[in-house]
Amino acid sequence: MSLLKDFSYHTVCFALMKIVRTGNLSKQIKSLTELEIVSRNSPINKIGDNKKATFEINDNLLRFYFTFIYKNASALQVLGAEAFYDEYVAPTLTDFISRRFEGICRDYFSLQVRSGKLKGVRNIGSYYYDDPVHRKNGEFDVALELADGYAIYEAKYYAQPMTLDEIRREAQQVANIKELAVKQLGFIAINGFVEQEKPYTYLDGNDIFAGM
C-alpha cells in the first residue's frame, strides 16, 4: 500500500470509523480508494455489476483492527489481551487468515503471468456463481479468465492436508455450475494433500510461496 505510509494509522482509522458510524460511504470511499487504503473488488464475470462489488481494507493491520477490535474495544479493556484473544479472536482467526490466503493465491498467479511463466490469461480474480438447482450462490476463490473459458482453483487454508473426499466434493460443486466453462480445475491447500487424482492441478503452500 504505497500511499498509506504518508498517513498515520490514527488518521486512517479515524476516516474508516467515520464511515462506519455515519454510513456516509459514498463521500469517503473515493478518497480512501485513491489512497489505496481500500480497494473495490468485483468477480471477473461480474465486472459491471455494482451489486456484486465489494470494498475491502488493503492493510492487514487495519483489517485485523476492524475485524476484531473496533466493535469490541470495551471488552478488550475489561478482559485483557489474553482472555480477549481467546474469546473474540481465536474462534474466527482461521477464517480471517484463509481470506487473506485466497488473495495470496491470486497474487501468485498474477506474478506467474507477469514473469511470463503463465500464458493466455486475460484476467484474475474470483468467479460469482448462481446454482438455481441447489438454490445457492457464492464465489469460487481463484479464477483465471482464458480465451475460451476459465481455470478455477479452490484455495483451502486447512490445518491438515486436504483429503480426496474434500477434493471430490469441491469438484462436484464446480461441475454443478452449468454456465461455467471450466478448462482447468485445481486445488491449492496450504498443508498439501492426503491423496491426489487426475485430472486436477495441485499446489501447496510451498509452491505458492516459492513462486512469490
Which residues are covered by each model-predicted region?
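Long, low-complexity, charge-rich intrinsically disordered regions
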Residues: G149, A155-K156, Q173-I177, I190-G192
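Short conserved micro-motifs at the rims of enzyme active sites and ligand-binding pockets
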Residues: T67-I69, E154, E197-K198
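Conserved nucleotide-binding/hydrolysis micro-motifs of P-loop NTPases
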Residues: N45, Y158-A159, G192-V194
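Extended hydrophobic-aromatic, low-complexity segments
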Residues: S74-L76, K117-G120, V133-K136, F140, ...
